Amino acid sequence: MPGHDGTTLRPLSSQSDYEACIELQRKTWGRDFSDVVPLSILKITQKAGGIAAGAFAPDGRMLGFVHGLTGVRNGQVFHWSHMLAVDPEARDLGLGSRLKLYQREVLLGMGIGRVE
């Protein structure tokens, strides 16, 4: 989903995508942040119906990401929107909103209407 500025929103798919996501978590919340979502969980999230997606500049650099887990509670499928970050150098460009709308679009396409 390319934007007018050439930014593309898409699922994380390569080793470098996952590593960039981990680095952006540390850049956003600090090197000592203890709740970094590791590469293995980002991949499992996707395999289990969750979302691990990024906003990428035309040069391939990750500008932001969104992460959430899909599950079942009381017999109802729902999505837990866990984390969103935008690189400080790319803030105030609407990327956070675009990532949340991307997340919504993907979830609705999967038939998931409840997000917490």
Question: Locations of the language-model features?
Answer:
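Basic/polar N-terminal segments that are highly enriched at the extreme N-terminus
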Residues: M1-G6
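Short polybasic/polar patches that bind polyanions
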Residues: K27, R91, L108
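A conserved beta-strand-loop-helix scaffold within acyl/acetyltransferase catalytic domains
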Residues: T7-P88
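Conserved acetyl-CoA-binding loop-helix of GNAT-fold acetyltransferases
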Residues: D92-E105
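Conserved GNAT acetyl-CoA-binding A-motif
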Residues: L107-E116
